[in-house]
Regions:
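Short, aromatic-rich membrane-interface segments at the entry and exit
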Residues: 36-43
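Conserved beta-hairpin
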Residues: 50-83
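N-terminal membrane-targeting/pre-transmembrane regions
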Residues: 1-35, 112-115, 156
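Helical coiled-coil signaling stalks immediately cytosolic to transmembrane anchors
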Residues: 138-139
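Short Pro/Gly-enriched beta-strand edge/turn motifs at strand-loop
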Residues: 43-47, 86-89
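Non-transmembrane, membrane-adjacent beta-strand/coil modules in membrane-associated proteins
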Residues: 72-132, 145-155
């Protein structure tokens, strides 16, 4: 079994969350003199942060390769995973839309296409190994837009 996953604290979306938390904390500190305003803003801030964290957690997927299946798992929402048996996979797409998006994986089976799972917990340095391993197992792996990431880590 091979797991393609980086530590939870190193996911790329964390860099987006840090400034938001700092800005909200500064706004909260400005309201300390007024208890009623402080409590109201605290409730609003907690609601906003809860929403942002819940949305960010939908991007936290990593990939597990077992002897006869490919598993895409989300550690934040443990119920949210997909397991694909190797004998049912027709094609795998590991792509990158560019800009502020994150790489994704999509598996095509005879029955249907899977969702595009944003693999923010897969380290960029692991993509060449993941793609090579999948191709060695005989799968067609398409990598639209991923050449930027693959070329960046080619000489490491």
């Amino acid at each position: 079994m091979k797991i393609y996953r980086r530590p939870f604290k190193k996911f790329i979306s964390m860099y987006t969350l840090k400034p938001i938390v700092v800005i909200l904390a500064l706004f909260l500190l400005m309201t300390i003199g007024n208890l009623k305003g402080f409590l109201v803003f605290l409730v609003i801030e907690l609601c906003v942060l809860s929403f942002i964290v819940a949305c960010t957690a939908t991007q936290l997927f990593y990939v597990v390769l077992t002897e006869n299946s490919l598993i895409v798992q989300n550690p934040a929402y443990r119920f949210w995973y997909a397991e694909f048996q190797f004998n049912t996979i027709e094609k795998i797409e590991i792509g990158y839309k560019g800009g502020l998006s994150r790489p994704y994986i999509q598996v095509m089976t005879p029955a249907k296409k899977s969702w595009r799972y944003v693999t923010d917990l897969v380290d960029e340095r692991d993509y060449p190994d993941l793609i090579q391993t999948l191709r060695e197992k005989g799968f067609t792996v398409e990598t639209p837009g991923l050449h930027h990431i693959l070329n960046k880590h080619e000489n490491l």
